């Protein structure tokens, strides 16, 4: 129904009533057939797993609230509480935080590992600590260097023995070859000498030749003796 206001005996509709009437009488625009279809609904993204914020091992041991930008959180995870326990016993939490704040982030990991190692060495050897471990390692290095030098000397000696043995074998082979060559030369010389003897007469033939000459001399003497009286 329209609400009417009476002004001087004349009923006039109110503004709210007129607005309602215009809304009901306004035709609804139907989508034109040439309009583009609505975009397909985007696939629903899987729900993100809830992030469980767990305090780091340092804050858990110290029983304090772990802040978002905790200096100790990246280096002492909650899964390894013994790491912070060892360092905390020797250096203390305040000193560890102070050391880390004085260093750039690129060197903090090495610093934490060094503090944990030194704290463990101090707990194992309260007197010398890390220096004792370094001393033992240096002594091992010296012993290994001495063994290496000894092995190198032995290796040089074995190489010299090998070279001398090879030289001895070479000399023996050369001597053997020279002996064989001399034997072959001797055999060839003897064979050539024997072949040359075929052209030399034997002693019997020489004696026969000499006998023939003696016979000739005797005949000549006999003939001369026959002619001797004729000339006397």
Curated annotation (Swiss-Prot):
Tissue specificity of this protein: Expressed in young shoots, stems, leaves and flowers.
Domain annotation LOB: ranges: 54-155
Compositional bias annotation for Low complexity: 188-202
Domain of life the protein comes from: Eukaryota
PROSITE patterns to which the protein is assigned, alphabetical: LOB (PS50891)
InterPro entries recorded: LOB
Residue stretches of biased makeup (Pro residues): 34-50
Region (Disordered): 1-50, 181-218
One of the Pfam families matching this protein, by short name: LOB
Positions in coiled-coil regions: none
Record family assignment: Belongs to the LOB domain-containing protein family.
Listed name of the protein: LOB domain-containing protein 11
Organism: Arabidopsis thaliana (Mouse-ear cress)
Source species taxonomy: Eukaryota, Viridiplantae, Streptophyta, Embryophyta, Tracheophyta
Originating gene: LBD11
């Amino acid at each position: 129904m329209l609400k009417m206001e009476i002004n001087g005996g004349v009923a006039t509709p109110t503004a709210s009533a007129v607005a309602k009437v215009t809304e009901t009488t306004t035709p609804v625009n139907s989508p034109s057939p040439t309009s583009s279809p609505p975009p397909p609904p985007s696939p629903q993204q899987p729900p993100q797993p809830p992030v469980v914020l767990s305090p780091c091992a340092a804050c858990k041991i110290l029983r304090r609230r772990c802040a978002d930008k905790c200096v100790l959180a990246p280096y002492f995870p909650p899964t390894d509480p013994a790491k912070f326990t060892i360092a905390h016993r020797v250096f203390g939490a305040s000193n560890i935080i102070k050391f880390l704040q004085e260093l750039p982030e690129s060197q903090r990991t090495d610093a934490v590992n060094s503090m944990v190692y030194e704290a463990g060495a101090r707990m194992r050897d309260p007197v010398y600590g890390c220096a004792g471990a370094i001393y033992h390692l240096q002594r091992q290095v010296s012993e290994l260097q001495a063994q290496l030098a000894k092995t190198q000397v032995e290796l040089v000696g074995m190489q010299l023995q090998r070279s001398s043995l090879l030289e001895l074998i070479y000399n023996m082979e050369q001597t053997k070859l020279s002996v064989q060559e001399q034997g072959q030369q001797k055999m060839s010389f003897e064979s050539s000498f024997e072949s040359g003897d075929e052209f030399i007469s034997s002693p019997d033939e020489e004696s026969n030749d000499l006998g023939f000459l003696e016979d000739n001399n005797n005949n000549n003497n006999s003939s001369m003796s026959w002619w001797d009286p004729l000339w006397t």
